């Protein structure tokens, strides 16, 4: 951990990228545990459990708080960014996922034998609130643990 910090002095950025990567990597085993299906595409796609976007922005905000303080402008910007990203993940993109699922079902039922398109819409775009909370917790707690190691 210390060698990584020496190479890249921005600890908040290191923490954010680390927890984004971990959250992306965890998606495949979690999907297998829940659905008994291995889907390696989850490593490079949006959506799923946990929210890697939430992990990233919460790790960044936590790093900014630890590095610059809770009263800093940097922390305020990171918190605002985190709120926007998490709202988008659980709200707007989740709604788009539901619409894609319904449109795919309509196409399947309405145009049986007469496909209008071979390509289906991607249904896994957003996150449930729980997936966002888990991602956020990973980012916050993970960054706190990393910071502790960096301080020793």
Regions found by a protein language model. Give the residues of each.
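Helix-loop-helix hairpins and the membrane-proximal interhelical loops
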Residues: 1-25, 33-36
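General secondary-structure edge motif
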Residues: 2-5, 9, 31, 83, ...
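Membrane-embedded catalytic cores of phosphoryl/pyrophosphoryl-handling enzymes
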Residues: 21, 25, 40-152
């Amino acid at each position: 951990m210390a060698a990584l910090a020496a190479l890249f002095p921005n600890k908040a950025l290191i923490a954010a990228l680390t927890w984004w990567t971990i959250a992306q990597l965890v998606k495949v085993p979690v999907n297998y545990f829940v659905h008994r299906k291995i889907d390696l595409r989850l490593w490079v796609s949006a959506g799923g459990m946990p929210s890697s976007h939430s992990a990233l922005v919460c790790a960044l905000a936590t790093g900014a708080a630890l590095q610059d303080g809770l009263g800093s402008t940097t922390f305020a910007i990171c918190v605002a960014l985190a709120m926007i990203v998490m709202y988008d993940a659980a709200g707007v993109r989740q709604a788009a996922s539901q619409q894609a699922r319904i449109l795919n079902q309509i196409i399947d039922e309405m145009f049986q034998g007469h496909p209008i398109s071979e390509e289906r819409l991607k249904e896994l775009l957003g996150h449930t609130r729980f997936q966002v909370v888990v991602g956020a917790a990973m980012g916050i707690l993970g960054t706190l643990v990393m910071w502790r190691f960096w301080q020793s």
